[in-house]
UniProtKB/Swiss-Prot annotation:
Component of the 19S proteasome regulatory particle complex. The 26S proteasome consists of a 20S core particle (CP) and two 19S regulatory subunits (RP). The regulatory particle is made of a lid composed of 9 subunits, a base containing 6 ATPases including PSMC4 and few additional components. Interacts with NR1I3. Interacts with PAAF1. Interacts with TRIM5. Interacts with ZFAND1. Keywords: Acetylation, ATP-binding, Cytoplasm, Nucleotide-binding, Nucleus, Phosphoprotein, Proteasome. It comes from Homo sapiens (Human). This is 26S proteasome regulatory subunit 6B. The keyword ATP-binding applies. The lineage of its organism: Eukaryota, Metazoa, Chordata, Craniata, Vertebrata. One of its GO terms (molecular function) is ATP hydrolysis activity. The modification Phosphothreonine is found at residue 25. It holds the Pfam family Prot_ATP_ID_OB_C. The modification Phosphoserine is found at residues 21, 28.
């Protein structure tokens, strides 16, 4: 056996090797060994114990979830009870840490108070209006930014229906207003490419009845920007500090809704030349003017907010308001000349049923100084005279009588003021 290279010891060693390699010979159908069964059983028991443990944990988590829901509902009810009115209005001054702050009350006292955990800390900014608990003075709510109820922003359905075509004449004024107000809002890149800053504000001045407010209405109609209209006298309030606060609210509202246009009519009510004021009311008006100047200087050119001001007394305005950088463009609205009269008459009478005998050129050629409002009043009065006589056509005699009535009335008013 040794001669042919077969050793007995090696042969004996190969016999158990055959038994070990039996699973590879396709005899696995004979089933696992007893040792394998014991391993599988022990593994099964272990998994069963883990399953029972997980089931117990699941029940515990469900019970804990129910308890947390009850606590959450209880906490919500507690927060509602804490925030229930009446509450004390205060002012947030400074945050000490995440849970406490210093607030000021309406009585003038400052308090070191706790902050309700549900309040968003990002809303707590200096001078923000907050609600304090009536007993503990704890800070329980953050009020929205203050805005005066008289400040109205015209929505798309509230904007006037006055169009540029409804305004007779004033071609130069229309062009200047559109260049200073509309163009920077719609094509700001043009100014950027040229390398100049667009006008910040526009002053419209001229005699009464020359179309200043009407042109502002047309701007509001044709632009998609937010339009805020206030009258200068609205800033003069009863209590000290209310007027400057209202000015801040107007500009804050405009910045929040940019692009926006602020139209301040009768600006001479608060922007007259400053003098040595002797009364508290005069000093308050001057403080309103200072706040207005500050807000106009604080304009960020990246914010699309434009200011339009209108007045009949441009000579009484403070020079600080008129300087370039605040009101860059000043547009005069003079009494209409002959060409402007013709355009205004034709625009107003375009919707009227006039007789062929009515010669508008005769009224245009008359030398009387009349404004656009006077021309509109003449046309309206002639229509009323036709209605009085149950006619559907306005005759020449109606126009003549209306013209004399309006012009005579204006002369009497002027003589009265003299």
């Amino acid at each position: 056996m040794e001669e042919i290279g077969i050793l007995v010891e090696k042969a004996q060693d190969e016999i158990p090797a055959l038994s070990v390699s039996r699973p590879q010979t396709g005899l696995s159908f004979l089933g696992p060994e007893p040792e394998d069964l014991e391993d599988l059983y022990s593994r099964y028991k272990k998994l069963q114990q883990e399953l029972e443990f997980l089931e117990v944990q699941e029940e515990y988590i469900k019970d804990e979830q129910k308890n947390l829901k009850k606590e959450f509902l209880h906490a919500q009810e507690e927060v509602k009870r804490i925030q229930s009115i009446p509450l004390v209005i205060g002012q947030f001054l400074e945050a000490v840490d995440q849970n406490t702050a210093i607030v000021g009350s309406t009585t003038g006292s400052n308090y070191y108070v706790r902050i309700l955990s549900t309040i968003d800390r990002e809303l707590l900014k200096p001078n923000a209006s907050v609600a304090l608990h009536k007993h503990s003075n704890a800070l329980v709510d953050v009020l929205p930014p203050e805005a005066d109820s008289s400040i109205m922003m015209l929505t798309s359905d509230q904007k006037p229906d006055v169009m540029y075509a409804d305004i007779g004449g004033m071609d130069i004024q229309k062009q200047e207003v559109r260049e200073a107000v509309e163009l920077p809002l719609t094509h700001f890149e043009l100014y950027k490419q040229i390398g100049i800053d667009p006008p910040r504000g526009v002053l419209m001045y001229g005699p009464p009845g020359c179309g200043k407010t009407m042109l502002a209405k047309a701007v509001a109609h044709h632009t998609t920007a937010a339009f805020i209209r206030v009258v200068g006298s609205e800033f003069v309030q009863k209590y000290l500090g209310e007027g400057p606060r209202m000015v801040r609210d107007v500009f804050r509202l405009a910045k929040e809704n940019a692009p926006a246009i602020i139209f301040i009519d009768e600006i001479d009510a608060i922007a007259t030349k400053r003098f040595d004021a002797q009364t508290g009311a005069d000093r308050e008006v001057q403080r309103i003017l200072l706040e207005l100047l500050n807000q106009m200087d604080g304009f960020d050119q990246n914010v699309n907010v434009k200011v339009i001001m209108a007045t009949n007394r441009a000579d009484t305005l403070d020079p600080a308001l008129l300087r370039p950088g605040r009101l860059d463009r000043k547009i005069e609205f003079p009494l209409p000349d002959r060409r402007q009269k013709r355009l205004i008459f034709s625009t107003i009478t375009s919707k009227m049923n006039l007789s062929e005998e009515v010669d508008l050129e005769d009224y245009v050629a008359r030398p009387d100084k009349i404004s656009g409002a006077d021309i509109n009043s003449i046309c309206q009065e002639s229509g009323m005279l036709a209605v009085r006589e149950n006619r559907y056509i306005v005759l020449a005699k109606d126009f003549e009588k209306a013209y004399k009535t309006v012009i005579k009335k204006d002369e009497q008013e002027h003589e009265f003021y003299k």
